[in-house]
């Protein structure tokens, strides 16, 4: 407690004249003698003006020296001085005690983050007013005078008033209050009263309760991470409360102060918890995070703790980052951020492991949080190696020089921990990080080291072990190409994690695929059992490396294939398997692109895809890789619709690769899908069921997943029973962040454009669309729009408005351009990005249609603009394939001219391309549809 010396002036902050301000307040007291309200108002006006000036100076200094901790110290110093001046004004000019008694004493104390002596620009102020006994009229008046003045200055203040006895009693029973008192710092008033609180807190609360406190703080940390997303590599991190953020450093220091009774982090070196290098790392991480946080508050003008996309670039510029080939300035900044978050995680792990190692009987929560293993007290040799021991269920070194005398041990230790289900002793973690210089060319080329690495990659719980290798730096040093993408973020809204975290997560999902039993991975799991045994290692290394060349000027798929050709022979792969890995990496986006943006019922599409994959075995491997890749992007990206598209593409292509396009095989799959559907509707009359099945074309039965088919059937039946010409069914998918609208109506040449326009008029952004026409001329379209409201009821009302708009347009009661003109502009997140517009037109993917593929920055109403523009170009849209990847929209249209022919004339294609490029490049300018 009280780690910042009162009245200490931060370096380079002479602009705030505390003594001059105090004298000015005294002068105001004389000027307004007997007029309390006028005196208060004058003091508030004076101090508020000085605070504004001081904040401006602090921000200017931050932009100049980029030192966030100094900025936080300056802001805290100013706030301290203001509170001291207010206390003096209250006790000397407003409520001077006429008959001082023992009860008329008070200490004003900073608590919480403010108590640490560091303050972000928009942070709250937490104050504790300490009294010797119960509250008195004098104490209440003084506290209120200070609080009301602070509130009148526009500051956010949290406060409590307690006696010393009350503080001690509440601290015993409330961990939040206990932590707040742990971080108290004296500001003004009766110093002996504060000292009494500190002394009694140490002897009556802290003593003998270290294990309880540590367990509670680690449980809080675990719950905070669970709420905010377990990974420290989420690409819009919370600087304060996120994993690897400032709160983790605070938790670390709370524990250190409580257990070791230290006041400064430097004392942890003397206690043997950190070495000098780790202490410097702690300071460096804290300084960086404070720089980010202070800039974040200044830029946003609010207590914003989330480093969102729309703020990241400005923060990067303020911190001096510049763009390099292959990496934007913002990506370099965020890479630094995630490297710091990784180091914070390492420091926390070291402290927690050290604590558990020193506790004879660690608390159950502590043991569970840190190791999730049973606690033992003996040590023994690790099987298979005399260089390592097991100490308290943690792997440790048998001698200090085990890495030096055999550098292969730097890989072996991870394999032994994996095989024996062991956590890492803190001394072993330190030894590993200090020995990274031993990972040189000789070790990288060592056959034993590479064999051990492949065993790690292809054995149980590879995700956990690879993450530990990554966090200690071993993975990036052993596979240098991987080291280049450690903590690298991609500045887009599609990827949820840094590149290295994405790859490691993909390995985890690959192992789930291999274990089987998960419906969403059914096809991939089935194929995993059918690939050649020698290709198991091929798929594992392909998954690990598929994005390893991100951030280079060259296309990452092509560059990644080159990396694989250099690396795989070292890892023990023969020439054929090396080429297979390179091919998988080079084509790892192909299957996803074809499945989501092409007409899978078009024979030409299937033949072109078959020409790419070349063999059933390669298609099996590519399907597995694609599944793991999409699933590893982030929550809600993989869904049943995408799984069904991959399944359809796989089974449509398989006959082509095994001796010709087999309609029999295809017919069997259609029959099987219809039989599966029949089994779900045993309560329907046979003739009604047959009629309904006959209303759908083969593509519907092959491409739509069973649960959706069931929902469609019930929806269509209910709509027709009710006699609705137009019906809309609303479904909610919070996991994907979308609301789905299924529209059943008579088909209409402009229906897709009308639906898109209606969504735009409601400010709804279309992120996915599944469009089908029945044999009797009805449209059955499912549109996924970005979720705007937290409550389903509010989303439902928005969907109702969209339905009403569609109906009014179809009935001629509403002009769609008028409705669209009032639509919402795109959100602030999208404004942070720029996407180069692209349009491609070709006749190679279809025998009957010209395929137009457009890609550009997504915005509300874009699909409406595109469909309208295409229709105005005298083109008929036969089918559309709509998808968004974060901020990027990628829409594909199968079109003909008005006579039903492909667009072959180069001049016509050029005109179409020019018109669509102009539309994509425009900023929220809607095309006007025909009347």
Curated annotation (Swiss-Prot):
Catalytic activity: [protein-PII]-L-tyrosine + UTP = [protein-PII]-uridylyl-L-tyrosine + diphosphate; [protein-PII]-uridylyl-L-tyrosine + H2O = [protein-PII]-L-tyrosine + UMP + H(+)
EC number: 2.7.7.59, 3.1.4.-
GO molecular function: [protein-PII] uridylyltransferase activity; phosphoric diester hydrolase activity
Cofactor(s) essential for the protein: Mg(2+)
Activity control, per UniProt: Uridylyltransferase (UTase) activity is inhibited by glutamine, while glutamine activates uridylyl-removing (UR) activity.
InterPro entries: ACT-like_dom_sf, ACT_dom, HD/PDEase_dom, HD_domain, NT_sf, PII_UdlTrfase/GS_AdlTrfase, Polymerase_NTP_transf_dom, UTase/UR
Protein name: Bifunctional uridylyltransferase/uridylyl-removing enzyme
Gene: glnD
